Every structure is written in C-alpha cells, then in structure tokens.
Amino acid sequence: MAPFKTLCNKGINMEITAVTTFHYEGMLSYGQRFLDSWAKNVDQSIKLLVYAEDCTPVANSDNIIIIDAKKALPKLVAFKNKWGAVPKANGIPPQEIIDQRPRDHHKKFKWDAVRFANKVYAVFDAVERSTDWLVWVDADTYVHSPWSREDFVRQLPNESWITFVGRGTEKQTWPECGFYGLNLKHTKCQEFLAEFERMYEEAELGIFKLREWHDSYVFGHILNIMRFQNPNVFDYSAGIYIKTAKTGGGGHPLINTELGRWIDHMKGGRKGKMKSSVEKDLMTARPEAYWNEG
C-alpha cells in the first residue's frame, strides 16, 4: 500500500466537482449503486455531475446532478456520428498495427476510441460547469466508507496541476484513469485539457496518430509530455511500484493507494462480483472494514 502523505491544502473552501457517465446497461449493472454509495458516504459539499446516456438514474442526494448526455454533449454526438461505423475507431486496428502488434492487436479496448469518448467528452463539458477542481470517477466505482471533505481535499494538493493513478514508470505504461483530478485554476492544467480535447476533435491528426487510442493511453501520452514541462503532478500510486511494470497493465493500483480507504473500483470482470478481489488485487492487507468483510 502506498504510504499516506499529508497534503496540506489551503483551499479548504475550494469548489470540488466530480463527474462520471454511464448508459442504461451501466446504470443497472453498477451506475445506480455508485450513485447510492456517493449519496451515502461522500461529503455533501462535493458535487457529482452524472452524464446519463439513454437512462434516468435516481439522485438520492442534493449534491448529485443528473445531466442528459445526448443533449449536453453535442461534440460527443458528432464524434460518434463521424466514427461510429469506422472499424479502426471501434476496436479493429488498421493492418499496419495488426502487423506490428501480433501479441495484442486483438485486445479491442486499446483501439476503441468511440467507447471511451463518452468519458472524455463528459469531462470536457464538466470543466465548463466547475470552478476549482474537477475529479473524474469511473461509474463502476463504489464508495464503501464515509469520505469527509477534509480527506477529499487532501487528495487534491493545490501545488499540483493534475492528479492521477499511475501504473509504474516503464515507458509503455499508461495511467489507470478510474480516478483523476484536474486543478482548473492552473494554466498547465488548462493546456492539458485543450490538447486532450484537440486530440479527439482533430482525431486523424490526434488520437489516430498514437500507438493506441483508448482514453487512458491518450491521457498518458499528453501527461508524459507536459509533466516534463511542469513536474508538479501528483501520482497516487507513486509508492506502490518497486519494480517497473512490464506492460501497460500494472495490476489494480487504485485500491492499493490511499484512495482505497474510501473506494473500490470494479474495472473489467470485477463488475460481476461487485467487489475487487481481496486475495488477488490487494498488494497488502487493508485495515478498512470493507476489505475485511466476508
């Protein structure tokens, strides 16, 4: 487990906005459960924007705001209209990548730009509805323990222009984008967001110029460039990896960071069990009651 670092943050009164998105099937499988856990456990001062696609989730708290994704995200609709029927944007890489990547070209998520565009366009719109910090949280997350404002603020150090969950230092790795924070008052963060959006709006000259085009890879590509220009970034998992990850996977870092005190992330096949595996996913035992329940 990464050692906890006390992050003194003078902005105790800063506005914190979180954002997530899901479709109808996602709402039934994990999304509503996430919203209910947020309403129960997260401090009321922290707002959650929910971009709902073709569904009507229940907001059981005044700090949860439901937004119709199709109405609020015209750029996402345009992106899907343009790329929705194009194989390379939907998990089928072009032949040159198939030739270059015999071991992993079949892993469709790496080239599914349309699927992951839902996340990034929700972020781009939420930026316009936020003031100080914007935090992305995947909808297959579960807030298992009370999360106070003070503890939440500590995860967003004002000296950093971005926070993220890394997967090690090997050049092939990309962040685990289930949770990240954007310091909107910082000029470098604004530069990052402008380039992030450009990569999608000018896709042929943006995401499709990269080796992979899922959102985490695009995020990591821009981050790796801009952190050399301004190294004031905060990696929640910096203390986890003694050795560099051999591939981009890097295990299940989020729950092994300080964030695991409050949230679980049911990424991939974990959605069916509705909980990460204590035996397989935790690097060391955690003291929180959630991780010790039968």
Feature-to-residue mapping (PLM):
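Short beta-alpha junction loops
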Residues: 52-57, 141, 168-169
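Catalytic core and acceptor-binding pocket of nucleotide-sugar-dependent glycosyltransferases
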Residues: 184-290
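A structural signal for well-ordered alpha-helical segments within the folded catalytic domains
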Residues: 29-32, 117-121, 213-221
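GT-A fold catalytic core of metal-dependent nucleotide-sugar glycosyltransferases
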Residues: 111, 115-165
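Short acidic-hydrophobic catalytic motif
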Residues: 108
